Amino acid sequence: MNDVSERLSFFAALYQVDRQPAAGMWLLYGTIFVLAVIVFKLGFAKRLPVLKSAVVYVFLALGCTVLTFLGVFLPVAEGLVVAALILIIYKIRLYQSKKGQSAKS
């Protein structure tokens, strides 16, 4: 027979979603939500008023609920980790570039 634990994504296997479904799904949801917030802040966020920002994060939380169910067998959290790393590298290089240009001026 097919063993479900063999098909789990890395984070789902790490949080043992197959053995502890309640705690594992909450941990997976928290991981996906935190990573989605990081990717959103690094790549897409603009300065918004507090209420508009709250609405954005509510919809982000709702979207992460769907992503959590997909993230059990698909590499959703892993993709968010890669996206966050790429955006962090981009922001560091952008900061260094601006710092170098201001030093030349």
Swiss-Prot record:
Keyword line: Cell membrane, Membrane, Transmembrane, Transmembrane helix
Main location: membrane
Membrane topology (UniProt): Multi-pass membrane protein
Source organism, top-level taxon: Bacteria
Alphabetical list of Pfam families matching this protein: YlaH
Subcellular location field: Cell membrane
Membrane-crossing residue ranges in chain numbering: 25-45, 48-68, 69-89
Gene Ontology cellular-component annotations: plasma membrane
InterPro entries: YlaH (IPR025620)
Keyword Nucleotide-binding applies: no
Name of the protein in its database record: Uncharacterized membrane protein YlaH
Species this protein is from: Bacillus subtilis (strain 168)
Name of the gene encoding the protein in the UniProt record: ylaH
